[in-house]
Amino acid sequence: MAPKGKDLTRKVYEIICHRWPIHPSGICRIIGLELTVSNISKIKYHFDILKQKEMIHTKQIDRALVAWPAEIDKIRVVHEMMKGI
């Protein structure tokens, strides 16, 4: 059985951290949810919560929404600064 509420938000964040970049349907597959519009929308809702808390970044690529941890952008900035040295 899939987690619900805050447990699902936490699980979605863990999956994003370990398998980024990822989209909602990929998370549905990992959790074991059937790929329906309803379940994909449910995962997207948790993407929105995590984005509002600034824990992840998202980008719309054509019709696909892709997410990755916010920490990755921090690493990218440090990498860019080190290239300049």
Would you name each region that the model predicts?
Residues 1-18, 39, 78:
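Short alpha-helical segments that sit at the start of domains
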Residues 3-6, 60-82:
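Short, cationic-aromatic polyanion-contact patches
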Residues 14, 29, 45:
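DNA-binding alpha-helical recognition surfaces that contact promoter or target DNA
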Residues 18, 49-52:
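The C-terminal cap of the DNA-recognition helix in HTH/winged-HTH DNA-binding domains
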Residues 22-31:
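Short acidic, hydrophobic short linear motifs in intrinsically disordered regions
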Residues 36-49:
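Short amphipathic alpha-helical interaction segments
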Residues 51-61:
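A short, conserved structural fragment
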